[in-house]
């Protein structure tokens, strides 16, 4: 789950917005 910009993510987050990809988040997303 991505909560803030710059947080590392291991897998894509498509909840709310396309904010996370296999790497780093660029947008704040909720989910």
UniProtKB/Swiss-Prot annotation:
Subcellular location(s) per record: Secreted
InterPro entries for the chain: Conotoxin_omega-typ_CS
Known tissue expression: Expressed by the venom duct.
Disulfide-bond pairs as recorded: 2-20, 9-25, 19-29
GO molecular function (one): toxin activity
Keyword field: Disulfide bond, Knottin, Secreted, Toxin
GO cellular-component term (any): extracellular region
Residues in the signal sequence: none
Principal cellular location given in the protein's record: secreted
UniProt remark on domains: The cysteine framework is VI/VII (C-C-CC-C-C). The presence of a 'disulfide through disulfide knot' structurally defines this protein as a knottin.
Family as reported in the entry's similarity comment: Belongs to the conotoxin O1 superfamily.
Protein name per the record: Conotoxin pc6b
Natural source organism: Conus pictus (Cone snail)
